[in-house]
Amino acid sequence: MAVQEAMRRELNQRLKLDPAKTAVLAIDTHRGHLDPEIATMPVAADIAAEVVQASARLIEHTRAAGIPTAYLVMHNRVVNGRSEYLRNPFWAAVEDVRASLTPDLPSTISGHNLVASPQTEVMPELAPGPGDVVITAKHRLSSFLDTDLDSWLRALGTETLLLIGINTNTCVQCAAFEAMNRDYAAVVVSDCVNSMYGEDLHDFSLENVARCFGWVLTVDEVIGKLTPVAGGVAV
């Protein structure tokens, strides 16, 4: 463990963030997960509030540095009276046994993030700004599959992705895998992600990313790397 921690510190020191070549991916930072009043697949309310607060702080700094954000928002259409979510065999099976994907909280697969529902709205505290893009063609765990995300990133000359959002162990980790496969530097911002599935899978996923294919940094660490330096000292 000491060897792994030493390696992680060295890797974190080597990571440089060039605002001109960096983008934020805000993955499913919508009301369907993060607004306890209407969420259809809710993160626990206290955790949701922490993720929103940390993410708002991150975006304030990245936006000031000229870094754009892509908002990936899950959308599901109703086809023949049934959510297209239920074309997936596993999700259909969970729906059939009326099981909840969220420990200790009710959730609905068939009613999750239907097109034009309020659940598909980005949390107001994280609202898109000029130069940002909202991608609504996300229908599964992947932020890249059948979307124009990669095209947008390539057009910007992006090399590094700051990943935030829900869920750490599904959509966020999937984005980190796919970013790595496309030769982006994947950085998961640890206090800007969490999971409706529970802390065990959240923690496992952060460890998996950090040890295998990307960086895991806190908001403070990211801000520190974006802060201009004078004489080698952050100002």
Which stretches of residues belong to each language-model region?
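Short beta-strand segments at enzyme active-site cores
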Residues: 27, 67-76, 80, 189
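Short, well-ordered beta-to-alpha junction loops that form the rim of enzyme active sites
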Residues: 72-75, 82, 138, 166
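Surface-exposed cleft-lining segments at the edges of enzyme active sites
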Residues: 33, 40-47, 109, 161-162
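Active-site-adjacent betaalpha module
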Residues: 1-23, 60, 64-65, 88-235
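Catalytic P-loop NTPase motifs of RecA-like helicase/translocase cores
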Residues: 33-34, 196
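Surface-exposed, active-site-proximal loop segments in enzymatic domains
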Residues: 36-43, 84-86, 179
